[in-house]
């Protein structure tokens, strides 16, 4: 097979597993509902993209949930499959996506999927360990390019990047919190059970719907930067081999 044709086919296949467009569309549905002052609809839209209970959330908590989801999934929904695609092509990218999807479906700590879910969660933690950190660093640069507070993003990243039950999720959430001068994290109800969590970032100002838009901008800029970095590494590898 022609190598350029193979690359084109693999790129098209991998495009299907990148969550960039989906994340933006679903989070902006929450944003639109909030701008329309329809908290009930915003809660419902948020419930489509988060695992926490949303029925009793305030406007600020709904906004925070959307921001956290976009920030976290920038790493495991975009940068991770992109990195694995550059390492092992479509097969490795799809293998990663399978692990990530399994974690999303059964990785919660409930009695029904306790052991299988624990295995899925540990696999996902392992698979996302490097991508999450790459995403965090790229997002700090993205914050600078978007004229956000990159210095604060770096500070909160260093301080709060482990303030999460997952070893990876706070990598990009901490950068987002610092860049936007907001506080993320904190406990929530999952399946009717309260789960305490540490906060991420400083409570400098109230979270507002426009932060969803800014987080999407961060997500896209981080994705572009990551593509450039991975492509440069790939080209250097080809040059070395030749």
Report the location of each language-model feature.
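Hydrophobic alpha-helical transmembrane segments
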Residues: 1-94, 107-242
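Active-site His/Glu-centered metal-binding helix of metallohydrolases
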Residues: 98, 102, 106
């Amino acid at each position: 097979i022609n190598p350029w044709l193979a690359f084109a086919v693999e790129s098209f296949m991998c495009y299907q597993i990148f969550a960039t467009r989906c994340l933006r569309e679903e989070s902006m549905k929450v944003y639109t509902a909030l701008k329309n002052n329809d908290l009930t609809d915003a809660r419902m839209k948020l419930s489509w993209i988060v695992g926490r209970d949303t029925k009793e959330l305030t406007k600020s908590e709904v906004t925070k949930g959307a921001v956290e989801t976009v920030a976290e999934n920038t790493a495991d929904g975009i940068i991770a499959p992109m990195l694995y695609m550059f390492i092992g092509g479509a097969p490795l990218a799809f293998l990663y996506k399978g692990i990530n999807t399994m974690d999303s479906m059964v990785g919660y700590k409930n009695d029904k999927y306790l052991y299988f879910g624990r295995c899925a969660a540990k696999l996902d933690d392992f698979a996302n360990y490097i991508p999450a950190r790459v995403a965090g660093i790229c997002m700090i640069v993205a914050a600078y390019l978007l004229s956000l507070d990159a210095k604060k993003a770096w500070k909160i990243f260093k301080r709060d990047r482990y303030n999460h039950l997952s070893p990876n999720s706070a990598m990009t959430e901490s950068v987002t919190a610092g860049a936007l001068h907001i506080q993320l994290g904190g406990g929530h109800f999952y399946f009717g059970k309260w789960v305490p969590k540490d906060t991420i970032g400083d409570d400098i100002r109230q979270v507002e719907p426009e932060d969803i838009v800014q987080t999407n901008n961060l997500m896209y800029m981080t994705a572009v930067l990551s593509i450039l970095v991975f492509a440069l590494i790939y080209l250097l590898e080809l040059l070395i081999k030749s």
